[in-house]
Amino acid sequence: MNILIQLSHPAHFHLYKNAIRNYQEDGHMVFVLIKTKDILENLLQNAGIEYFNILPVAHRGSKLEILWDMIVRDWRIMRFCRKHAIDILSGSTPEVAQVAWLLGLKSINTTEDDATVIGAVIKAMQPFVKCIL
């Protein structure tokens, strides 16, 4: 099975690092996609986990710029999924839910924060998922 995991924060690395190893040990192809954030790349490099950076430079600023970055990530993830015949997506970003829905794929969506803390993320994810873990 081809599994895509998107990480957008160092906390996501700690949430997924063991699952990534377990999937690989079980013979699955695991593709890790990231956007540049704090020490995320260093954590992956130190763990020896191969990754693809789909947004090396973010435009953080206005809400419009944040929305634009999300659309860019959606597009890049969608292209990646088609190129690598992804079967299932997992992560804690709206893009995972949105792309899975658009491509008719399954997704496992997680959050590491309370919905009141990341309300905008939940609102962007909720229409596309059955459940958020």
Regions found by a protein language model. Name each.
Residues 7, 24-69:
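Conserved nucleotide-sugar phosphate-binding/catalytic loop shared by glycosyltransferases and other
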Residues 63-85:
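An amphipathic, basic-hydrophobic alpha-helix
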Residues 105-133:
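Active-site-proximal region of nucleotide-activated glycan assembly enzymes
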Residues 1-10:
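Nucleotide-activated donor-dependent transferases that construct or modify glycoconjugates
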Residues 22, 43, 99, 123-125:
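Hydrophobic/aromatic ligand-binding patch that stacks against planar heteroaromatic rings
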Residues 10-24:
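Short amphipathic alpha-helix
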Residues 2, 86-88:
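Structural motif
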Residues 38, 89-103:
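An aromatic- and histidine-rich active-site surface loop
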